[in-house]
Amino acid sequence: VIEFGGLSGLINNASVYQPISFDELTFEEFKKNFTIHVEVPFLLTKGLFEQLKAKSGSVIGLVDTSQGRAWKDLTHYTASKNALRQMMVNLAGDLHPHVRVNCIAPGAIISAAWEIEHFASVLEKVPMGRSGEPKDIASAAKFLLESDHISGQIINVDGGWTLVE
């Protein structure tokens, strides 16, 4: 950070995704999701705020497209990702004008977290007819990090999935 003259961006990208039926869901697993998806981004943002403020920086939270939807066996995941989404929106109001805060909501992106059977059924519903790739998320993040007049926004990077789902 010192070598590059300070910190101008933070991307809260840590995640855990494991479908678990509600009857098998433990409080420990529920809490783990909130720790990774909400507590860690809070602590990082809080701990790095002064450095970000000094550079008029940007914070990005990777949320998901689950808001307002019921996803089977993902109560713990969707509850924590939507808590992160709301925290980021609130931080956009709390940290302005010093730090911009936005979210990226990935749709079907090729990753080790997706089970191939589930992935195939999701792709059938994506208007663009293909999955996204990590570079699609990186492009959105680069755009938000460089955009000095965008804050409090959620960008869906989902090939149009949320339009039809």
Predicted feature locations:
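Catalytic Tyr-X3-Lys loop
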Residues: 8, 16, 23-42, 60, ...
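Conserved NAD(P)H cofactor-binding loop of Rossmann-fold oxidoreductase domains
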Residues: 13-18, 160
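Substrate-binding pocket helix/loop in short-chain dehydrogenase/reductase
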Residues: 21-22, 29-31, 114, 122
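Amphipathic alpha-helical dimer-interface segment in Rossmann-like NAD(P)H-dependent oxidoreductases
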Residues: 36-54, 92-93, 97, 142, ...
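Catalytic loop of short-chain dehydrogenase/reductase
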Residues: 58-83, 88-96
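Conserved Rossmann-fold SDR core element
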Residues: 85, 95-109, 150-157
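Catalytic Tyr-x(3-8)-Lys segment
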Residues: 117-136
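C-terminal substrate-recognition "lid" of short-chain dehydrogenase/reductases
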Residues: 133-157, 162
